[in-house]
Amino acid sequence: MSLETVPKDLRHLRACLLCSLVKTIDQFEYDGCDNCESYLQMKGNREMVYECTSSSFDGVIAMMSPEDSWVAKWQRIGNFKPGVYAVTVTGRLPPGVVRELKSRGVIYRSRDTAVKT
């Protein structure tokens, strides 16, 4: 797991609404999302960071070997990069972002357990 992926602080943590990666707001703005940057383009765009991440999430998983992890398969994060992931994330991506994902062939499954998709 790359040290750039690990949250540098326990304050101001946010989770990506698409893949549930957990980082600080500054890390998302500086590096974007390690898994979703090509779709969400958060790097250098604080407004997109606020729209595409949530500060409300439950549980964290530190995933180091996605190919060997049954937890990664259970959480549907087995194809993602090693890092710290939220178990559930409250919130949904904006409709415009969901439409853009769909047009690029990406299926969006909300990680919000309060909302059925």
UniProtKB/Swiss-Prot annotation:
GO molecular function: RNA polymerase II complex binding; zinc ion binding
Annotated zinc fingers (C4-type), start-end: 16-36
Chain segments carrying region Interaction with SUPT5H: 1-40
Pfam family, one: Spt4
Subcellular compartments: Nucleus
GO cellular component assignments: DSIF complex
Key words, A-Z: Activator, Metal-binding, Nucleus, Repressor, Transcription, Transcription regulation, Zinc, Zinc-finger
Functional summary from the UniProt entry: May function as a component of the DRB sensitivity-inducing factor complex (DSIF complex), which regulates transcription elongation by RNA polymerase II. Probably enhances transcriptional pausing at sites proximal to the promoter, which may facilitate the assembly of an elongation competent RNA polymerase II complex. Also acts to stimulate transcriptional elongation at low nucleotide concentrations. Regulation of transcriptional elongation by this protein is required for the expression of genes which control neuronal development.
Family, per entry: Belongs to the SPT4 family.
Name recorded for this polypeptide: Transcription elongation factor SPT4
